[in-house]
Curated annotation (Swiss-Prot):
UniProt keyword Transmembrane present: yes
Stated name of the protein: Respiratory supercomplex factor 1, mitochondrial
An individual GO BP term: mitochondrial respirasome assembly
Subcellular location: Mitochondrion membrane
Known function: Cytochrome c oxidase subunit which plays a role in assembly of respiratory supercomplexes.
Membrane-spanning ranges: 66-82, 102-119
Native species: Sclerotinia sclerotiorum (strain ATCC 18683 / 1980 / Ss-1)
């Protein structure tokens, strides 16, 4: 029978956050990996430090920070400013914009490292949850397969029982027909014997008179 045990209650209400499509995963990666948290959001996730415990998980609340792509934005602005200064012939401003682009790229690299460190524990919890979820789905699939096999086995037993019942009925009818035929034959033989006995008696009487 399939297990009715739900997933950890600490994950209830946030399942959609973990079961993501490709676009959601891409968006989350872009937000988490290269960026440094600049503020706090009000979105709160309740995570279990030990997801395998499905009955009494202890919970802790983690506040996910709101992040922005400052390095990417600054790099883009520096390139746009450099392009405009080149068209305007302002070489000094062009040099400043290129230096700003280098600084922005350095900031982006630092943001990638810092963001990766910041989200490391969250990624571990996510992988742990995904492992539990995959194991739960595999278990449910296996139990459903076993249930289907059991249902087919019961159906096969029922069909076999019906065939045996029909065969017994047919054998019973054949036996009853045989008894009727035997009784009829016995009656015919008895009648023939009686007839022969009467004929013999009549013959004896006739021959006795002579």
């Amino acid at each position: 029978m399939p297990s009715n045990t739900p997933l950890p209650s600490s994950f209830d209400g946030d399942t959609d956050f973990y079961e993501e499509n490709r676009w959601q995963k891409l968006t989350r990666r872009l937000k988490e990996e290269p960026l440094i948290p600049l503020g706090k959001s009000t979105h709160t996730l309740t995570l279990s430090p030990s997801p395998p415990s499905l009955h009494h998980p202890s919970t802790q609340k983690l506040t996910h920070p709101l992040t922005h792509p400052p390095g990417c934005i600054l790099t883009t602005l520096a390139l746009v400013g450099a392009t405009r200064s080149i068209r305007a012939g302002d070489h000094n401003r062009t040099q400043r914009m290129f230096r700003a682009r280098i600084y922005a790229q350095g900031f982006t690299l630092l943001a990638m490292v810092a963001g990766s460190m910041y989200w490391d524990s969250d990624r571990k919890k996510r992988k742990e949850f995904e492992g539990v979820l995959a194991e739960q789905k595999a278990k449910e699939k296996n139990e459903a397969w076993i249930k289907e096999l059991e249902a087919r086995d019961e159906e096969e037993k029922e069909m076999r029982r019906m065939r045996d019942e029909r065969r017994r009925r047919a054998e019973g009818k054949s036996a009853a027909s045989g008894l009727v035929v035997d009784a009829a034959n016995a009656g015919a033989e008895e009648g023939e014997k009686t007839k022969n006995g009467i004929v013999d008696q009549m013959k004896g009487m006739v021959w006795g008179k002579k």
